[in-house]
Structures are given as structure tokens and as C-alpha cells.
Amino acid sequence: MPTITLPDGSQRSFDHPVSVAEVAASIGAGLAKATVAGKVNGKLVDACDIIDSDATLQIITPKDEEGLEIIRHSCAHLVGHAVKQLYPTAKMVIGPVIDEGFYYDIAFERPFTPDDMAAIEQRMHQLIDTEYDVIKKVTPRAEVIEVFKARGEDYKLRLVEDMPNEQAMGLYYHEEYVDMCRGPHVPNTRFLKSFKLTKLSGAYWRGDAKNEQLQRVYGTAWADKKQLAAYIQRIEEAEKRDHRKIGKRLGLFHTQEEAPGMVFWHPNGWTLYQVLEQYMRKVQRDNGYLEIKTPQVVDRSLWEKSGHWANYADNMFTTESESRDYAIKPMNCPCHVQVFNQGLKSYRELPMRLAEFGACHRNEPSGALHGIMRVRAFTQDDAHIFCTEEQMQAESAAFIKLTMDVYRDFGFTDVEMKLSTRPEKRVGSDELWDRAEAALAAALDSAGLPYDLQPGEGAFYGPKIEFSLKDCLGRVWQCGTLQLDFNLPVRLGAEYVSEDNSRKHPVMLHRAILGSFERFVGILIEHYEGAFPAWLAPTQAVIMNITDKQADFVVQVEKTLNESGFRAKSDLRNEKIGFKIREHTLLKVPYLLVIGDKEVEMQTVAVRTREGADLGSMPVAQFAEFLAQAVSRRGRPDSE
């Protein structure tokens, strides 16, 4: 009979097989009521699952991350229950957990409307209020097929076909509604009270635009009402910061249907984009990178050699000319190897750091496109470092330091790092992987940076480090990457002459700091809500006159500031000064300079900030010095 070992090391013995729920009840009524599921010998199981031999057990409650994920998964099933009651002809497809929520894909004869979503949410609350038990039944495959045939659930039958080796499957019954899942799920709907449906969208069966279109219902769920309210507040704040709305309001960019996933940059937005590019160009030049430019359209033969044609063709835009097939490059790496291959290199020339602001195109599904955050045409701050195995650690350490410095300049100090190690299927010897993983780990350790280990999550051709920024709302954006590659230099014949005069393949480090410029601009817009630090602001100062008498001095100040390397504009419109100040404050211009008769007489400017602070009057040269200091701080706090 089982002896159960709990996380604190205490043990409980039973004279009969017991469920997770029964063990929880033996500990206390409060824990029994809070039990969502269990973790038996490290494996998540339902609260009703039986333990019949000695085991370790962790009781999972809504306070645990796994408990929250189970609540979200069960909410997806609850969507199915409500939809089938309201729209009996709907066919249920899949309902997975996603970051901070869940969705359910549904086949229905018409698109769902916001009114439908409200009705589904209301019915879900009604079902939750009955506090019914969710019943799990492990069911033989043949019976599962009969269950879904009887209900006309064609997509569920297709999913069963996808699992030919599964002879028994978990069916979860929400009263008359049944769904198929590996689980676990909550034992009762009382755990699901803190949820909200958030949006509707279209989707495709299996994510393929050639397949039938489905309706996708998104939602979020939390452990309690307080967490849900905090999330809703965060979402409302995020909507206020939506880069698409701010981009339009500030005249930064737009997108349109005739060029899906492509950006029309307006003067203000293009100015911001160029500031990023010029900054990164200087940073990379100062750190030993050589800037190059490679073709946009490349013959399919190179993509076949690199492996992209076989593995990435669906995401590539292709064309044909004079009986030859070409692809618009989705990435820069194969072209950078071609530059390295021009002339045999010596070990003395390594490391060689080749950088490109590489314009790439990827055929992303139209449903996945989102403003400038997810596009089809984008530019990367892409670079590839060709080095020896012995140089891997030093190059990695230098890149990590550079990356963290860049992020600080943009105002991001909370950076998460993940080290992904060897997957089961991989190229290269275990000894090479040992050295590569050790090099990346040592580089992170030498920088004194904490990181999460992701075993088995590396690419087949090498381990990698991912850098993710946390913005002012706590959202995490994966931007930077350092990817070691043992494969591509071999495939594309990259070699150097080593110290012993033999030829060797270099290790290739794929690296990016910002990632996509377009996406990074979107992140900056939302992080700063359009109120960029002075160094990034498209217009750093606007000079305004009170009456026509000051116009000449306004123009003179504008010329002085622009000749000093700043981005200044004048506003000579025949409008009240209060109107001008309000307008440029809404346009998020950092500094507003007002010139009246007194300022003309004293040859000064009255300086206000967009936040409303009055900095007083000062000579133009003094303001230029003040602005230069603000620009030099970049996005770092004043104390740095």
C-alpha cells in the first residue's frame, strides 16, 4: 500500500490506493478545497487520479504556476461547453493555453460577433455558478471515435487520427459536453470564476491558409478576482499604448491592405528609424564590426545548399527570371558566408565580425500580422562572427556586454536571459557541444548575469542565448539572440587556415541585439507611450512665437539648434500660444521653447517640458548645452 512523500519530506501511509484529492483531504480541509491537481513523481495528474504505489506528491493549487495553467486550460473547455449550448451546430477544434490566457478554435457557419462573445461569456458564468464537477474518463480509442461520431465533431475525429498509437484517451465531461485532452483539468468549475473573454479573430485549421477558416475565441483566466482586475488594468494600459494608434497620432508610420505586412514610414517615424540605425552603426563600428551589404534576391541554389529551401520554403517569397528560380532573402546568414568565402582566410584574421542592416522578407500568415510588431518586410541589426573554437567564449562575453549596454541606452534594465542547450537531434560531436555550452555559460557567468537554463531547446546546429526585455507594463519581448552554429560553415564551405597550416571550418555566431528594427520601434513606442527620450525623439525641440514680431528670432533659434546637430522645428502659425503648447505637448515633443518680446530683447528662450515643467528662460547656447546633456544620457536615468 502506498506511502506518499510530500515536498517537506513528511510521509503519509495508506492501506489502500488513494487519489490526489484524498491525500489532500487527509492533510486538511482547506488544502482539499484548494486542490486543482497533483504532481506525482514529477508528473502532473488530475486530482481524481489514483496513486497505488509509493510516490512523491506535490499538491497543485491555484497559487502554483501549473495550477494557473490548468485553470486556463479548463476555461478553454468551458468555452466549448457554452458554445455548444448556444450554437449547437458549431464544431469544436482545439483549445490550448497561451501566455496569460487561452483560446478555442471553432468551426461555425458565420463569424462570431462581439454580441456572440458577450453571450458566450455570460453562459460560462452561469455554468460556473452551478459548480459542477468535471469528470475524467480514460476511454478506449474505439469508444472515443464513437463518442465524437455521435456528436458530429469532425475535427475531434481528425485529431484522433493524428494519434494512431494512442489506444486510450482522456475524455473530460462538463455535464453533457465532452472534450478530449491529456489534462489535467480542474475537478470543479468553482476554480474558473476569475476569467474574461478578450477578443475574437479568424484562424485556419492547422494554421494553413489553404485550409478552412475557423473562429478563434480568446480569453484570460486567473487564480482570483484581484489578479484578473490587475490584468484587465494592464491590458487597458496596453491599449492606450498601442503602437498603431500612437504611430498614427504622432505621424510615425502607417500600414495598408495593398502592402500587407509592409511599413509606410512617415517623416517622423523614418527619423526615429534612422536614429536607431546610426546609433547601431556606430556601436558596431566601435566594437570591431565590418559593415557589409548583400543582395536581396538570390538564386535558389544557395538556399538549397544552406538547407533553407527544404526547411523554410513556405516562408520565402520566390520569383522566376530567365528560367531560374530565386528567393527574396528571409535571412542574411548564407550571404554573409559568401562574403567570408571570398579569399582564403588565416586564423590571424579571426574573429571576423560582419554586420549588415539586412532587409529581409518572410511570408508570414496574414492573420499573424500586427502593426509593425509582426511584418513581412523588416530590417535586422544582423551580424555574424566567424571565429575559432578557442575564441567562442571571449566573443560571446563581448557580445553579452555590448548587448546589455545597448539595452541600457534604450532605457531597458530588466533583461531576462535563457541558455538553450543541445536537442536530441543535432549535428556536431558531444565534445564540441560540451565546449560550446560551457563557453556560453562561462560568458554569462563572467558578466555576473542570472539566466534560465532550457535543456534541449537549442537549435540542431548549436546552443543559443536569448535576450528578452521587460517593458514598463511587465511584458516580455524577446529581442536579442546569440546562436552558435557548427553546421552552416560546413554546408557552405567556409574555411580558414589554422596555426598548424590545416584547413578548418570556423564557428559561426549569429547575433542580433535589437532584432527587427520595425518591431523594436514598436516596442519603444509602447514602452514610452510615444514620449521618447530626447535622443530618440523625431523632433527634440519646437520653437514658438507669441506674435509675428518674434518670427525672425524664432527662425534664428531654429537654425542655430539644427546647425548644432539637434532636431528642432519652428511653429510660426497665427494661433494662440496656449493652443500651440497643447498641440506639441500631445505630439510628445520633449522641449517647448516660447519666444515673446522679452525673450527677443534678452536673446533667450523660455523652456518648458512636455510634462509641464517650467525650466525658466535661458540663452540659446545654454539650452543647447542642456539638450546635449539630455541627449548624451540617452535612455539612462539621470544618476548614471
Swiss-Prot record:
Cellular component annotations (GO), alphabetically ordered: cytosol
Domain TGS: 1-61
Protein localization: Cytoplasm
Alphabetical list of Pfam families matching this protein: HGTP_anticodon, TGS, tRNA-synt_2b, tRNA_SAD
MF terms in GO: ATP binding; metal ion binding; threonine-tRNA ligase activity; tRNA binding
EC number: 6.1.1.3
Region (Catalytic): 242-533
Subunit structure: Homodimer.
PANTHER family: THREONINE--TRNA LIGASE, CHLOROPLASTIC_MITOCHONDRIAL 2, THREONINE-TRNA LIGASE
Name of the molecule in the record: Threonine--tRNA ligase
Organism: Pseudomonas fluorescens (strain Pf0-1)
